[in-house]
Amino acid sequence: MQGSVTEFLKPRLVDIEQISPTHAKVTLEPLERGFGYTLGNALRRILLSSMPGCAVTEVEIDGVLHEYSSKEGVQEDVIEVLLNLKGLAVSVEGKDEATLTLNKSGAGPVTAGDFTHDGDVEIVNPEHVICHLTGDYELVMRVKVERGRGYVPAASRQSADDDERPIGRLLVDASFSPVERIAYSVDAARVEQRTDLDKLVIEMETNGTLDPEEAIRRAATILAEQLDAFVELRDISEPEEKEEKPEFDPILLRPVDDLELTVRSANCLKAEAIQYIGDLVQRTEVELLKTPNLGKKSLTEIKDVLASRGLSLGMRLENWPPASLIDND
């Protein structure tokens, strides 16, 4: 294998050893010396943290109001049931979320295969035990599965959902990554006379929803996309000066005298230190009616004049007043 001394070797996928349906070894070689650790560490981090997948995020169990309780007829307490639900390996096609329902009665184990769902959902580990019923009891459960990435604790979603979340809907820490364990090793490799090359062996275990070869391909794609910015790196030129747009509509910066209100209305506004149209539109009808000597007739006049200019009372203006008005004052 002849080539330029500055030319880098390109690795190839040499072997995929399928140890079990969820456990595989992937070998890539040859790699330049040191690149085994460089690529192995980068791919390991991406495979652990950035692979999209599906996970249980919410659970409703009939008769259960919170996780620190138990359900009559269920051997496990609610917290243990929620932990078992986190082990559910699910894939959802064509949408970002799905709902699984369970209605089981009679003594015996309750497994993932007891859930009912639509055709877009596949439960990869139907034998996974959720809980055990101890007698002739009924267990009714609804589980929400969402698509996501990484690890999202329930506490991070709790504050946003508290006001709308019904009592009894339990939030679950969501680990979306289908990769459960990953390790890599770097061995010596040889190509013709070169013996200083690396061979990268990546060993991974998944929950069965993602093929190991596809996982490597996705991780490499993510890494390449993140490095694109460096490939396209160019000299940073001076940014073009853009014409500054006015922060506010110019009409808001005009004095209220320009509205040509009646003397009574104009005097009432001046008494309240309302100098500019921008000051006026931020007042509400209730606030203006509290102004001495300003009645409903004057209020109607003000509303009509503002409406003719495309304005109204009760408007919100961020960063008002502008610095130019403050300087003038």
From Swiss-Prot:
It catalyses: RNA(n) + a ribonucleoside 5'-triphosphate = RNA(n+1) + diphosphate. NCBIfam families: PRK05182.1-2, PRK05182.2-5, rpoA. This is DNA-directed RNA polymerase subunit alpha. One of its GO terms (biological process) is DNA-templated transcription. It comes from Idiomarina loihiensis (strain ATCC BAA-735 / DSM 15497 / L2-TR). The gene is rpoA. Gene3D superfamilies: 5' to 3' exonuclease, C-terminal subdomain, DNA-directed RNA polymerase, insert domain, RNA polymerase, RBP11-like subunit. Keywords: DNA-directed RNA polymerase, Nucleotidyltransferase, Transcription, Transferase. Residues 1-234 are annotated as: Alpha N-terminal domain (alpha-NTD).
